[in-house]
Regions:
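A generic transmembrane alpha-helix motif of multi-pass inner-membrane proteins
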Residues: 180, 371, 375-376, 404-463
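Helix-loop-helix connectors at the membrane interface of multi-pass transporters/channels
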Residues: 1-6, 92-95, 101, 121-142, ...
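Helix-loop-helix junctions that connect adjacent transmembrane segments
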Residues: 17-22, 59-60, 137, 166-299
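Membrane-interface loop-to-helix entry segments
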Residues: 139-196, 247-251, 372-382, 409, ...
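Membrane-interface "cap" regions at the ends of multi-pass membrane proteins
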Residues: 1-49, 53-58, 64, 70-75, ...
Length: 463
């Protein structure tokens, strides 16, 4: 469960036109730590059971496929950050490389992600709470979490940075402890030789490309947010070198954590057909390797992470809608309103809360995850194409390493991302393409048949 930091937008500064220069103080190691915090070492937990099931027990292999797509895309983000060091975002890259119209649709796809982050966080928090207290129905948990998140965001209470740091330390401890206990369990029950086994990675009798790629498309959720490193380009001492390096290394480190987790988890619970509940399978594995104590520890971790993600996700989404309403991209009277006392976009928060509640009741967790990844992969594909258009075509950097960096790498990233993107389920693609079509219709109306340039929202850094 991921979320962008909605507290980053300071409305008073935006409205007063603050143009101060940010000091460049961040090193590549600062960027790496930031990226790992954003991705979270426990990001694999909510989707493990789903990936393991749809990939026919080959979740580790699905993560390796997802890594390939992410590595080439990470390199492309690094390339684009060298050109736009003061505004690192998919929206900025696409708008400036292609056209404001394509940039608008890229931003429209990202809006889908902002809507789904708090929604899928609420769904998973409710599923986890229902495992802890099954006497309370799932739908009641959904209502309670949605209401609580809405009240906190309306009142403007923000999560403290210290609390996030402590949470990161706890989640890292949890990830290391889980892997260590899984290794111990396999060693005790199956012997040392069982720790290195092909069944944790590849099952020839169940292998099929389609399920593997579907697993990769869902596993990509564990990488969502790595591109946020590029938003720190203006704060970085050497953005042209360090952004790309840090983004690629973060993807590699995240893969190591995820693959180690799913590999040993699959050795502990080899028969994925017997998961009591697919969405919370990681809790059952935790109970097997660490008893009730680890089960409760994992449950609390997932609950806190889910609520935290929902809080920051809704804050980011409501402020994005506020920025778009303020700039006239969407109705100003409805979305461009700030509460006079709390200073928060309350109308946008109410709307996002209602949509999140309805979505959590009507939508399965897997579909929410796939839709979130649908929007993300639209951005990933476009950023890879931006590198080709900007460096290979417009700048003509085609010789030697230029051919590799500006054509082969980004086109490989775009093709792998496209393949993974198209491997999403039919329902996810249907809803995703309908969303893009709605964006195209809105853009046509808003620009009077593409005669006018689309409005550009100053809140673009949120995307």
């Amino acid at each position: 469960m991921k979320a962008q930091d909605g507290g980053a937008l300071k409305e008073s500064e935006a409205q007063k036109g603050n143009t101060g220069v940010i000091r460049r103080v961040l090193t590549r190691w600062d960027l790496i730590l930031f990226g790992l915090v954003i991705l979270s070492p426990t990001a694999v937990y909510p989707v493990y059971g789903i990936v393991q099931t749809v990939a026919h027990g080959q979740a580790a292999l699905s993560y390796l496929v997802a890594m390939v797509a992410m590595l080439f895309t990470a390199a492309s983000y690094g390339r684009m950050a060298a050109i736009y060091p003061s505004a690192g975002s998919t929206y900025t890259y696409v708008q400036n490389t292609f056209s404001p119209y394509v940039g608008f649709l890229a931003g429209w796809a990202m809006i889908l992600d902002y809507f789904l982050i708090p929604l899928e966080s609420n769904i998973y928090a409710a599923l986890t709470a229902a495992r802890l207290v099954p006497q309370i129905p799932y739908i009641v948990w959904v209502f309670l979490f949605t209401l609580g998140v809405m009240i906190i965001n309306v009142r403007g209470i923000r999560l403290l940075a210290n609390a996030n740091t402590i949470m990161m330390a706890i989640m890292t401890t949890c990830a290391v402890l889980f892997i260590a206990l899984a290794i111990r369990y396999v060693h005790v029950h199956d012997g040392t030789s069982a720790l290195i086994s092909s069944r944790g990675l590849f099952r020839p009798h169940e292998f099929s490309v389609g399920p593997l790629m579907l697993g990769a498309s869902i596993a990509a959720l564990s990488y969502i947010g790595f591109d946020a490193i590029s938003t720190l380009a203006e704060d970085t001492v050497k953005p042209e070198k360090d952004i790309g390096f840090a983004t690629v290394l973060v993807c590699i480190l995240q893969t190591v954590i995820c693959v180690a987790t799913v590999y040993f988890a699959s050795l502990v619970w080899n028969n994925y057909h017997t998961f009591p509940q697919v969405e919370t399978a990681i809790l059952d594995i935790g109970h097997r390797i660490g008893g009730q104590i680890l089960f409760l520890f994992l449950t609390v971790i997932l609950l806190v992470a889910g609520v935290s993600s929902a809080l920051t996700g809704q804050a980011g989404f409501s402020r994005l809608l506020f920025a778009m309403g303020r700039d006239g991209v969407i109705p100003r009277s409805l979305f461009g309103y700030l509460h006079p006392r709390h200073g928060t976009p309350t109308r946008a928060i109410y709307i996002t809360s209602a949509a999140s509640l309805a979505g959590a009741v009507l939508m399965h967790f897997q579909i929410a995850v796939e839709l979130l990844n649908f929007g993300a992969f639209v951005g990933f594909i476009l950023v890879n194409l931006c590198v080709i258009q900007c460096f290979f075509i417009q700048r003509g950097e085609r010789r030697g390493m230029g051919l590799i960096r500006n054509l082969l790498f980004p086109i490989t990233g775009a093709l792998v991302c496209f393949y993974v993107w198209m491997s999403l389920s039919g329902n996810a693609k249907l809803v995703g393409f309908l969303w893009l079509a709605a964006g195209g219709v809105y853009l046509a109306i808003h620009t009077r048949g593409f005669k006018d340039r689309p409005s550009q929202w100053r809140g673009e850094e949120l995307i």
